[in-house]
């Protein structure tokens, strides 16, 4: 099987991380792949904010948990969080940001790094506190949170994929 196809099929969402640091060169490759995601009319509306500082990750985790209505860590102890935003003035901003998220996760897997898409970025960064954080990052109110891509190395064996349910491909017959 083609290596790229195999990578797409074997990627899994990981929700338990060790403290092992992702080497800078590996993280740079993942982020570079994210920046090359397709975008509508090549507008490249998405922006990635990379968090490696434990305190900053904890701050954003707390806000995310608050939106979710829990006090558990929605980032599962991951040592890196990439918050993806996109400019809502671009008609395809949600799709653009989503493709960045996909590229980040697939590139991470190709390099032996685990990942998971964590939702609620839109809700977190719609709050007054979230908007203040965005301002500190140089993002104005036109940017909308698309997702949080957590990255790191699993502290448990990663399970194999569950079988696909089927019926998700329909061929038109003439």
Predicted regions and their residues:
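Acidic, surface-exposed loops and disordered segments
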Residues: 1-174
